[in-house]
Regions:
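Conserved N-terminal Rossmann-fold NAD(P)-binding element of oxidoreductases
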Residues: 4-8
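Conserved SAM/SAH-binding loop
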Residues: 48-53
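Rossmann-fold NAD(P)-binding glycine/threonine-rich loop
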Residues: 90-113
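Hydrophobic/small residue at the entry helix of a nucleotide-binding pocket
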Residues: 12
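Beta-loop-alpha module in the N-terminal Rossmann-like domain of NAD(P)-dependent dehydrogenases
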Residues: 66-79, 94-95
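C-terminal catalytic/substrate-binding lobe primarily of soluble NAD(P)-dependent oxidoreductases
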Residues: 132-252
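NAD(P)-binding Rossmann-fold cofactor-contacting core
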Residues: 25-40
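N-terminal Rossmann-like NAD(P) cofactor-binding module of classical short-chain dehydrogenase/reductase
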Residues: 62-67, 87-89
Length: 252
């Protein structure tokens, strides 16, 4: 029998399942297609197919890892809660998972959401600092997964679901200003920063505060995504001119 059930094994899911097996944990993976290297592990069992057709047959006693793209993970989330599974949720969804709090209570389950690097680890570090100093005033998070060198095109390759990257660029960003939550357009406050060992890069606002928004831990909070210079301006220019082909970007 396995220790965890992983729904999805894309860029992030494949990495996490591999790490769990390296630590000696047994994981059952469900996705439309399972990478060959995962199939070779003696600690990994798998089912290839539609997660919505297979989820009802899974044991309710196991922790489920929601590693699906945001649009799919958002739909599966309440179904998992109603089953009573405890859930570790990485799906970057537009809706707030807190909307399911009462449903989770009624089904005696726990949902840990946005548990990636940022949001996720960044939120934990901010909470740790808040506890250590008995309060903080200003918080700025700057995060980005980028290639080591820029190129002549986008200077980027998605480290997680490409559709979620586009969501990150188009979803309004929520920030905290003087203790109040404000909503601004994503990609605004574009500015240059210096990154150690890499030089000049660019940062812009995105909706990454998430669980920090209602925490009351800081008077001013913002999260910025970091990219190589020119990347986001290329996105903005193609979007504004109508030349942006999201389907082509997802295929690339």
């Amino acid at each position: 029998m396995y220790d965890f059930i992983a729904l999805g094994c894309g860029l992030i899911g494949k990495f996490l399942v591999t790490e769990l097996s390296n630590l000696g944990y047994k994981t059952h993976v469900i996705d439309l297609k399972i990478p060959a290297e995962l199939k070779e592990s003696s600690l990994i069992t798998f089912q290839e197919g539609d997660v919505f057709q297979l989820v009802d047959d899974l044991p309710k006693s196991k922790v489920i890892l929601n590693l699906l793209p945001g649009s799919i993970g958002e739909i599966i989330r309440p179904l998992l809660i109603c089953r009573g599974n405890d859930i570790v949720d990485l799906a970057f969804t537009e809706s707030e998972p807190t909307m399911h709090n009462q449903l989770a209570i009624e089904n005696n389950c726990t949902l840990l959401w946005d548990v990636g690097i940022a949001p996720g680890l960044s939120n934990m570090l901010i909470k740790k600092e808040y506890n250590r100093d008995s309060g903080i005033k200003d918080v700025t998070v700057k995060v980005g997964g980028n290639p080591a060198q820029p190129d002549d095109d986008w200077s980027y390759m998605a480290p997680f679901s490409p559709s979620d990257v586009i969501e990150e660029y188009t979803r309004p960003a929520r920030i905290i200003v003087n203790g109040e939550v404000k909503t601004v357009d994503a990609l605004t406050d574009l500015h240059s920063i210096t990154v150690s060992d890499f030089g000049t890069m660019e940062a812009f606002l995105t909706d990454g505060l998430r669980s920090l928004l209602g925490s009351g831990m800081g008077s001013n909070m913002r999260e910025y995504t970091v990219r190589w210079p020119g990347h986001i301006q290329k996105f903005i220019d193609e979007r504004n001119s109508g030349e942006l082909d999201e389907r082509k970007l997802l295929e690339e």
